A protein has these predicted regions:
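Active-site gating/metal-coordination segments in enzymes
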Residues: 47-180
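Short, basic, glycine/proline-bearing loop/turn elements
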Residues: 15-20, 114-115, 231-238
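H/E-rich (His + Asp/Glu) clusters that bind or coordinate divalent metals
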Residues: 155-175, 189-306
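Hydrophobic faces of well-ordered beta-strands that scaffold small-molecule active sites
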Residues: 4-8, 43-45, 82-86, 111-113, ...
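Mid-to-C-terminal alpha-helical segments outside catalytic/metal-binding sites
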Residues: 1-42, 68-76, 97-101, 188, ...
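Active-site environment of divalent metal-dependent phosphoester hydrolases
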Residues: 11-14, 51-53, 90-92, 119, ...
Length: 306
């Protein structure tokens, strides 16, 4: 069965001296070897917007260098590697122009964007970025960055990683929904890392809040009145399978359906065997057609990969 891993991360080898990142994040040959061993046909490689060192993933120089690297990676390994552009569109027109270059000139397959930047969430992204994405029929891969909102309170037990990142995704997606961005842009395709954090778990609670938006004792709501319950917009999201267990994955399946679940491993950097990640999908007891969609067909459609 055709398998596409839609969630893996690599960096340029020239960046090794600038940080303390896992060695396999600089080793495409190791990625290809794991791919072959597990029967994965294609890996979608992206920037995680995480860097432990002296590089800032939000700068324009970082984006340009990464995008050039991604284009070379895709060119050197056709069919086996598909690469996404990186962009930090909150930081202005220069960054949106770089995303345009990455799609039009470099031929990258989509755009990876963090779930927040410098305390701003997804709804604060300039409209020009969404217009570019829609005009190019591109998919945006949403991945929490290394410095999420509230990071300073999560300095023990790597809580920034295990709680902070999925929380950042959850809050950012909720704001995107409630501010009406998905209602206004119904053709927007978003693939959310880690099954969208906890967005599937709180979708009904978003509906509760929206239904009681005019109930004064609970306090003020907001300016936007959606035409449908928030959960209807959550159901439009595409979610990857990086959940590290079957329970959340089943919840995601129930919320968006097999047609919007996309296999991913987060390897590298996560040093779990690809077979383990594939096992989470197998545990869902899907039909053969649904399994084929989740493991490969959905990703190929999202990123226009043959």
């Amino acid at each position: 069965m055709d398998v596409v891993d839609a969630h893996s991360h690599l960096f340029p080898a020239a960046w090794v001296p600038h940080g303390r990142m896992p060695a396999d994040m600089f080793d495409v040959e190791a990625l290809l070897a794991r791919q072959e061993e597990a029967g994965v046909a294609t890996s979608v490689v992206s920037d995680p917007h995480i860097w432990y060192g002296d590089l800032d993933p939000g700068t324009i120089d970082y984006a340009r260098e990464y995008n050039n690297f991604a284009a070379e990676l895709q060119r050197d390994h056709p069919n086996r590697v598909v690469a996404l552009a990186t962009a930090t569109p909150w930081r202005g027109q220069e960054h949106i122009a770089e995303a345009e270059r990455a799609l039009d000139e470099l031929g990258l397959a989509g755009i990876a964007v963090a779930t927040s930047d410098q305390g701003q969430y997804l709804e604060a992204i300039p409209e020009a970025f969404w217009e570019l994405v829609l005009d190019r029929d591109a998919t945006v891969f949403l991945h929490p960055g290394g410095t999420v909102v509230g990071q300073e309170l999560m300095d023990m037990y790597r809580l920034g990683e295990v709680c902070g990142r999925p929380l950042d995704t959850t809050v950012s997606l909720a704001r995107l929904v409630l501010h009406g961005v998905l209602e206004r842009l119904p053709r927007l395709r978003l693939l959310c890392a880690h099954a969208g954090g906890a967005i599937c778990a709180i979708a009904d609670r978003l509906d509760f809040g929206h239904e009681l938006r005019d109930y004064a004792p609970l306090g003020p709501w907001g300016a936007v009145n959606l035409s449908e319950p928030p959960s209807a917009y959550v159901a439009r999201l595409h979610l990857d399978t990086v959940t590290y267990g079957a329970a959340l994955l089943r919840l995601a399946l129930n919320r968006v359906g097999a047609s919007q679940l996309v296999f991913g491993s987060d390897n590298p950097p996560v040093p779990f065997p690809l077979r383990r990640s594939l096992g989470y999908v197998e545990a869902l007891d899907l039909t053969e057609g649904e399994t084929a969609a989740v493991l490969g067909r959905n990703a190929r459609a999202l990123f226009h990969v043959r």
